[in-house]
Amino acid sequence: VIAEKPSVAQSLATVIGATVRKDGYLEGNGWRVSWCVGHLAGLADADAYNPDYAKWRYDDLPILPEHWQMVVGADKKKQFDILKKLMNAPDVTEVVNACDAGREGELIFRSVYDLAGCQKPMKRLWISSMEDSAIREGFEHLRSGADYDGLYQAALCRAKADWLVGIN
């Protein structure tokens, strides 16, 4: 189970019985619960596509990446490595996206999922309340991650559009 932030992960973990603290996650009752700390990964800076773009020059515009790159922020690498290890652990059969319900939550989770090279089935916890009863009900009604592909694509398009407008 991967939440967007530690406080949410703690609430979810308490309800599902994952109360043993580990380095970067909680474990128990057959669950491992961790968090992303917001956007762990994002679109690469322009100089990742061409070192000449490290210094902004009008003559280089427009900068239009042919193949977009996602990168992990240097200050977030430790948590990313924890998530990658957890998602790809041999005993993990599926991964639950418990990031915030909405397009940004989809982008935050899937950026990490993709960069980690995870191929495990993905489920989605979609809740709008952090009440214990809402969390329990959400876990009883997990949906396929594929049901939210459109939201992910919308968030990714928004991120790319922001990048293009911001850089150009």
Predicted feature descriptions by range:
Residues 1-168:
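Intrinsically disordered, low-complexity regulatory segments
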